[in-house]
Amino acid sequence: MNPIEQGLRAVDRFQQHRRVPAVVIGVVRKYGDDRGGLLSALITYYGFVALIPLLLLLSTVLGFVLHGHPGAQQSVLNSALADFPIIGDQLRQNVHSLQGSGLALAIGALGLLYGALGITQVLQHAMAEVWNVPGVQRPGYWPRLARGLLLFTVLAAGLVLGTAAASLVGSALGGVPARVGGLLVSALLNTALCLACFRVLTPREIPTRALLPGCVVAGPLFTVLQAFGSLLVTHELRHAGQVYGFFATVIGLLSWLYLAAQITVYAAEANAVLARRLWPRSLLQPPLTAADEKVLSSVARQEERRPEQHVEVSFHDGERPGGAGEDGPHGPSSPGAR
């Protein structure tokens, strides 16, 4: 064993016997096992595609619900756009409510809603991957569609409550206290909204209390992302504006959405690790820890697609002689997953 490996194994032994670093490494390892980067990228893409239809739909619905109250309509819309640093101003100038007859508006609104539902499907898929739900146990199209509509309802309610709370804090306080109070209220509301959304997206058999730890962390992080997102995006676009011109706005939006997606996936991974006690994980294998075997078994059983299909997983010590069993790398004598 070379000195580098000796040092790494010493670090591995240390983290496995310390709860906090073991949990952190467990979350990071599970993020990798579940291909969390790919899930975050999918959420970013579908979130980007759904953004304009959702804003058009929001503006149109507000036009009906708050008819005769243009000030309140703009307040809610501006509150939604304020969550998008830098590009919020450009969106505000270009997003307008649909116009036309009642039937045309209804058809247009339904079309926008259907176009935006992709993000809800991806979020449900991400939660199923994080909790390693076998394919055979995942809901069909119509239950997923109903969950998607419920998610939009929860988000709309959160937006209205957030706008009302921000208005109350702004009217009751002024200056720096108003800013600090607004951030605290935003963190609390984001935590509650995150918990409500996770409850909608996560399989029913997962208890609500298991969803709370990740939301307690994600809520304030979303507030930080909203409050200081402009600085992050400005850093990202320092040179992109001259090179890409208008597309720099798209780059800024994608960067912001990807950070939000990563917070979401990491929060869900933290919930799964804490609820299922998926730590300590090994940094160097072999040997595998009990948590390693539990995660790898869950990932393998996740591939069950039919009720007639049953996946079993077994583990052995050390490497296989010759890298395979008697019948070759995929033969029946292979002692790996069956």
Stretches found by the model and what they are:
Residues 1-338:
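Membrane-embedded alpha-helices and immediately adjacent juxtamembrane helical segments
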